Every structure is written in C-alpha cells, then in structure tokens.
C-alpha cells in the first residue's frame, strides 16, 4: 500500500500529463472541447480514474459526450504511455475515463434554487395583500394564570379585570 499523499501527488501529475497531451499532442477531432478535471489513483497505484468534461461547439450547443468517450478510448494507450514516461513509476497505472458530472449537478442545483426563489417571491407577493380570516384577534383573552398567591393557589385574572384564587380544593374529596 502506498502512502495516500503519494497517491494524491501521482493523481495530480496524471491530470497534468493527460490534459497536456490532449491539448497539444493528440490530434483527434473527437477530443476538441475535452477538459480533464481530476484524477483519482487507487491506494496500490495500479488504477487511475481520470474525470473529464466536454464543452459544446458553441455556448448554447450540446456537447457530444459519446464522441469524446470514443476518442478517449482510442487515445487510452498513447496517454498511458505518456503517463508512464512522465511519472517514472515502476508500474504505470491503467487509465479509466469517466465523465465528470459535477458541472451538471451544479446547473441542476442552480435551477432548483432559482425555482425556490421564484416560489418565495410569489409567496411574498401574496402575503402583502393577505388579511386574517375572521376577527382581527381570533384569540380571546379568557384569563391568564399569573403568579402563585401566598396561600399556595394560583391567581387567575379574567378579561373583566377580576382576580380569583384557585387553591386546588375543588379536586379534593371531602371527608
């Protein structure tokens, strides 16, 4: 088992080598717009997963993920050779290319947040003109329980302003 720090360094180096090779050395039209975003190497340094995204031909154009995946599969051997020469490790890791869905997740979250903001704005507009149903104060003041009296009972103030003391004797059985 290799050190996790060594695996991270190797993954970073693989990311750099593969991105540079795709941009400057491999002339495949299917790799136009492919960007290497990350790489992960297993603890034994034998397998590397390289994550990529694909840009569309225009800002509004849909990227061709199938063509990019096919082009990366065609270039896998050349890229592994370049990784082996560039890293200097005893065993060159096998490369697996996986589409990075982080940007898709970000776009989806942005859409959900925009919908939530719009729903909040609609609710705020409705709330401005809303009036309570029924009376202005639907809760009647039937009396409130205040502090205990000196006799040990509770003083109850009614809405008429009268005070009554509840000593708790109502619930005791008489002898």
UniProtKB/Swiss-Prot annotation:
GO terms under cellular component: cytosol
BP GO terms, sorted: maturation of SSU-rRNA
Protein name per its UniProtKB record: Ribosome-binding factor A
Oligomeric and partner information: Monomer. Binds 30S ribosomal subunits, but not 50S ribosomal subunits or 70S ribosomes.
GO molecular function: ribosomal small subunit binding
Gene transcribed to yield this protein: rbfA
Gene3D superfamilies noted in UniProt: 3.30.300.20
HAMAP family: RbfA
Biased composition regions of type Acidic residues, renumbered to the chain: 162-175
Family: Belongs to the RbfA family.
Function comment: One of several proteins that assist in the late maturation steps of the functional core of the 30S ribosomal subunit. Associates with free 30S ribosomal subunits (but not with 30S subunits that are part of 70S ribosomes or polysomes). Required for efficient processing of 16S rRNA. May interact with the 5'-terminal helix region of 16S rRNA.
Region annotated Disordered, chain positions: 131-175
UniProt xrefs under Pfam families: RBFA
Disulfide topology: none
UniProt keyword list: Cytoplasm, Ribosome biogenesis
Subcellular compartments: Cytoplasm
